[in-house]
């Protein structure tokens, strides 16, 4: 939780 792009769910 901070200033970073959302991480997409891994397949």
Curated annotation (Swiss-Prot):
Gene Ontology cellular component list: extracellular region
Tissues in which the protein is found: Expressed by the venom gland.
Main location: secreted
Single GO MF annotation: toxin activity
Record-listed Pyrrolidone carboxylic acid modification sites: 1
Cellular compartments annotated: Secreted
Keywords in alphabetical order: Hypotensive agent, Metalloenzyme inhibitor, Metalloprotease inhibitor, Protease inhibitor, Pyrrolidone carboxylic acid, Secreted, Toxin
One GO biological process term: regulation of blood pressure
Function: This peptide evokes slight hypotension (-2 mmHg), when injected alone into rats. It has no bradykinin-potentiating effect, when 60 nmol of BPP-11h are coinjected with 0.5 ug of bradykinin into rats. It inhibits angiotensin converting enzyme (ACE) activity with a K(i)app of 87.07 uM.
Similarity remark: Belongs to the bradykinin-potentiating peptide family.
Record-given protein name: Bradykinin-potentiating peptide 11h
Lineage: Eukaryota, Metazoa, Chordata, Craniata, Vertebrata
